[in-house]
Amino acid sequence: MEAARPAGTFVVVGGGIAGVTCAEQLAINFPAEDILLVTASPVIKAVTNFKQVSKVLEEFDVEEQPSTMLENRFPNIKVIESGVKQLKSDKHCIFTEDGREYVYKKLCLCAGAKPKLICEGNPYVLGIRDTDSAQEFQKQLTKARRIMIVGNGGIALELAYEVEVCEVIWAIKDKAIGNTFFDAGAAEFLTSRLLSEKSEAKLAHKRTIYTVEEAKKETSTKSKADYVGSALGPDWHGGLALKGTEEFSHSIHIETKCEVKKIYLQEEFKIMKKKSLAFPKDHHKSVTVDKEMWPVYVELTNGSIYGCDFLVSATGVTPNVQPFLHGNDFDLGEDGGLRVDEQMRTSLPDIYAAGDICTACWPPSPVWQQMRLWTQARQMGCYAAKCMAAATMGHPIDMDFSFELFAHVTKFFNYKVVLLGKYNAQGLGVDHELMLRCTRGQEYIKVVMHNGRMMGAVLIGETDLEETFENLILNQMDLSSYGEDLLNPDIDIEDYFD
């Protein structure tokens, strides 16, 4: 083991959006200090083309780059390409997988999260979390005639829409798609797009750019079986050709209110003498037995069994805390993340955390909630760096304004989607009202009202209402007198509140 190095004041663990943003902000604050960024991957996630759309809403590209590009931009950032083997918080040092020891004065853990796999060690079950796993999925898909997607989050939603020339069985535990993001009305609006023929003229993807081939050590990622990649950014599928082998274009069947009960390999399935279902054609309810043989069979809790070439597990993530727990008495949140206070501090001195690995445990704004999304990873990483800087210099710091209002802009099924505040009436109980406006195939607008005040909104399509609604939620103005006119398409609501 090498002798401990005087490794500088700041060490950041994790090459995802939170870690890289944190390191960049520290490098700006302390240009004379070496900032160490420890990451198991040869590529890092960089935020580019950042645009502050409104007070809280932001848009940016996520670009995968070789770590050398980060070092070129910030000469005082030193990237250590190795996983963390152990953290000794009492000694203020970390040990990396390559046998080195690094001492820190302040440490920020941004190691992200790992996918919850339905079944560990099954070659026919793929989890999609990072670019490596997304590319493995693309490779498998080129040989596939039918796949099953299990899960109802953002990645599952995108896969269901983007996968072409292949039958897709989509199993969700909820009544409707996209339960994390949408109510039944928005789900119905999107489902009609999903089940209709897709337009050939798809809008150009504009956010994620993959430059994995530029990384000189790309192959080295394959040897690190335990490496947990950072989350995929927005439009992660933009550079991937998600096509299977069948002739037809887009064929999908949704199984609702069910989960995976058991997975059988082909030989096991033959011995069991069970019957699997054929792919339901034209959305008819008639059930026929599948005569084809498949490499893997999936039995659902509703009794249905389908054969497929492989199964995609997209059932969410768990914070990647395991490498840091041994010998360290961290307080953990209910979801398993490292608890952090309003200055992103964990329960251990001089250790901060940001992004998917942490659980926000400060009293939140009434219209903010933590969700493990790339926007919050960027905000938390940036704010954690500012908190570390303030503590180092002995300055007070106010909570960042981005935590005043939950705001997220993304794209689902080629629609622009904006989520604001308590967009699904989270935590409001029954004492709230919903206002809706929907033009099929064009836009879906939902506003959540509580005691005459706007608490949240879902905007699907090009509505141009996000800035106005953001202001109304932040201002908490009494809107009772406006009634239904808030969503009247014949009234320019922006003129009311300029």
From Swiss-Prot:
Cofactor: record remark: Binds 1 FAD per subunit.
Primary location recorded for the protein, binned into one broad class: nucleus
Cofactor: FAD
GO molecular function: oxidoreductase activity
Location of the protein in the cell: Nucleus; Cytoplasm; Cytoplasm, Myofibril, Sarcomere
Gene3D superfamilies (alphabetical): 3.30.390.30, FAD/NAD(P)-binding domain
Residues recorded with modification N-acetylmethionine: 1
BP-aspect Gene Ontology terms: cellular response to oxidative stress
One GO CC term on file: nucleus
Keywords for the protein's UniProt record, in alphabetical order: Acetylation, Cytoplasm, FAD, Flavoprotein, NADP, Nucleus, Oxidoreductase
Enzyme Commission number(s): 1.8.1.-
Sequence similarity: Belongs to the class-I pyridine nucleotide-disulfide oxidoreductase family. PYROXD1 subfamily.
Function: Probable FAD-dependent oxidoreductase; involved in the cellular oxidative stress response. Required for normal sarcomere structure and muscle fiber integrity.
Protein name according to UniProt: Pyridine nucleotide-disulfide oxidoreductase domain-containing protein 1
